From Swiss-Prot:
One of its GO terms (molecular function) is transmembrane transporter activity. It is a multi-pass membrane protein. Keywords: Cell inner membrane, Cell membrane, Membrane, Transmembrane, Transmembrane helix, Transport. It is found in: Cell inner membrane. It comes from the Bacteria. This is Autoinducer 2 import system permease protein LsrC. GO terms for cellular component: plasma membrane.
Amino acid sequence: MKTLLKNRELSAFFAIVALFVVLVALNPAYFILQTLAMIFASSQILCLLALGATLVMLTRNIDVSVGSTVGLCAIAVGVALNYGYGLATAIAFALAIGALAGAFNGLLVVGLRIPAIVATLGTLGLYRGVMLLWTGGKWIEGLPDSLKSLSEPAFIGVSPLGWLVLALLLAGGWLLSRTAFGRDFYAVGDNLAAARQLGVAVNRTRMLAFTLNGMLAACAGIVFAAQIGFVPNQTGSGLEMKAIAACVLGGISLLGGTGTLLGAFLGAFFLTQIDTVLVLFRLPAWWNDFIAGLVLLGVLVLDGRLRQALARHQRALKYSRFQPGNKGSKQVARFPERKSKEVA
């Protein structure tokens, strides 16, 4: 129990394995590598958003505008390609749009000191409005095969975009755990005042978190356009809540300073796995959000109970050392008794 609480990635991993076992038990035909590859392909958008949300949440902030950023950047890459620009130029354009959107969120939170939830709720509507004004409410269609080919299975059934997601996960995980740059994110979220005293560039770190989050949302928009082949005017709606839920499932604390990119990745994979299982068993689509929310609540309640039990256990161990008769207790020498003088 103690190991699971300290390594929340294990909890998410065991949940993924358990759900896969249930899936195979109900239908052994799904016990193939292709099933995992299909779930991973479906999870790539949410995985990218969860990675970006982790950076922001580590600094004790939150961004609920990433769904609109995904739609805006998917529109950007689609418009650029339809205007005849090359694939590399269109991708760079979308990444720049995402970085600007994230940096603007950071400016509102860091520069103007607007609470993150309020600022990003505002930009949620703003970016969605810009997207609709840009396209006139129309869909972007006729995307070239050069973009679609990026989402087609390649080496061991994983697409080039899938390998990009894994590369970002590995690189980001290494940066956060092995470099001073990554440790700054944890320091800012864990104790803001202490981070300032230690010389951490707090404002720069928070700005970077929002900017990188915007760029990862842009990557998600590019993946969406490549996988679907067109861009509807409601692209990205509701994804911000799923990204936050994936982070919480993976052990990212809403209070900042705790969690890993691997945990967020596994949380996103698990939520997508639930959707995929429902599709494979032909259950109505409206069950997806209900079951995902139910699972999230169940995990949070179980996690809270386990943490309380662990805290009680640790307190009991702490105070048991001072119980008389314990081998580990410290023996306190008694004062010698004074002999009373008899008065004649």
